[in-house]
Design a protein with these regions (language model features):
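Bacterial Sec-dependent N-terminal signal peptides
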Residues: 1-13
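N-terminal pre-domain segments of enzymes
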Residues: 11-50
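Accessory beta-strand-rich segments of carbohydrate-active enzymes
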Residues: 12-20, 40-43, 77, 83, ...
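Predominantly extracellular/luminal regions of secreted and cell-surface proteins
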Residues: 38-39, 50-79, 228
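Surface-exposed, low-complexity/disordered Ser/Thr/Gly/Pro/Asn-rich loops and linkers
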Residues: 73-102
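Beta-strand-rich binding/interaction modules
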Residues: 139-141, 260-277
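Short, solvent-exposed loop/linker segments at the N-terminal edge
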Residues: 252-262
Length: 277
């Protein structure tokens, strides 16, 4: 569960990874190859165009865990104590500030890293794949805003070909915003007996996000303080030729009544990212 992963030391992934992709996992928490840093957005005076340039001097920015959440990294940096210890996560103790009380700006953060684009990506289409950010985000590469995201579960494939510097250092900066409606742990006035606290007051359901971030019967009734704000899934870099195939889908139709024959229909999405207009 993500609510558990938020506060645990991340381990080396044991799931399949495409060997043709460069995964931008952080050194912190994941033993990855990339240095990620974070800084509170409303305390960052420089414009995004500067923050997202290679060689930007981060100064007092903190190390960040990516994939991970804002609170994940804040706990890692000893800003807040471990939520799973004792009563640290109790809302009424206010040890870790709650998003519903602080407002969205409190957990809105910049994350940035730098990466090299390999020489063998030359004359190819270069992609940045962002698998999941909770909840909204601005994606900046080398001083340019290349994409916006909203919704916890929607991946984005961003064509960075015209902005990538082949064989050179590149910078990626992502401004991450929490959910629009964080909800509260106040129980709903409706529902089955014993589940009134599930999803708090229900307002978090106005976002496309993880409802149990505000509290559920098998996790913290008091919820997760930042509502799992952050870059919670992988970010990767890869290159393709001019034809791109994505989202394969197989539809099966079984013959009745014996179900001894099946008709299989395979569909894919094919695009040419070099086409303009």
């Amino acid at each position: 569960l993500l609510v558990s992963a938020c506060f645990m030391q991340a381990q080396t992934p044991n799931y399949y990874r495409n060997p043709d992709k460069i995964y931008l996992d952080s050194k912190e928490g994941h033993n990855g190859s990339f240095t990620w840093q974070m800084h509170k957005a409303d305390e960052t005076k420089d414009p995004a165009e500067k923050i997202s340039q290679p060689g930007y001097q981060t100064g007092k920015w903190m190390p960040a865990i990516v994939p991970g959440t804002v609170l994940n990294s804040l706990v890692h940096n000893k800003v807040y104590p471990e939520p799973y210890y004792g009563m640290n996560n109790k809302l009424d103790r206010n040890i870790i500030p709650d998003l519903a009380k602080t407002g969205r700006e409190f957990y809105t953060y910049w994350f940035r890293t730098e990466f090299d684009v390999p020489e063998n990506y030359k004359d190819k289409i270069v992609w940045l794949q962002v698998d999941g950010i909770n909840y909204r985000a601005e994606i900046w590469v080398n001083g340019y805003l290349l994409g916006n995201m909203s919704g916890m579960f929607k991946p984005e494939y961003i064509n960075i070909t015209d902005f990538a510097r082949i064989g050179q250092k590149n910078a990626l900066a992502i401004k991450v915003y929490p959910v629009d409606m964080p909800g509260t742990i106040k129980p709903k006035q409706w529902g089955a007996a014993g589940e009134f606290h599930n999803g708090g007051d229900g307002n978090i359901g106005l976002n496309t996000t993880m409802l149990m971030s505000v509290g559920w019967d098998f996790t913290f009734n008091d919820g997760i303080r930042d509502r799992n704000t952050g870059i919670w899934k992988n970010i990767s870099l890869y290159a393709t030729d001019k034809a791109v195939i994505r989202h394969p889908f197989i539809k099966s139709e079984l013959s009745k009544p014996n179900y001894d024959l099946a008709k299989e229909t395979v569909s894919v999405e094919v695009t040419n990212p070099t086409q303009r207009g």
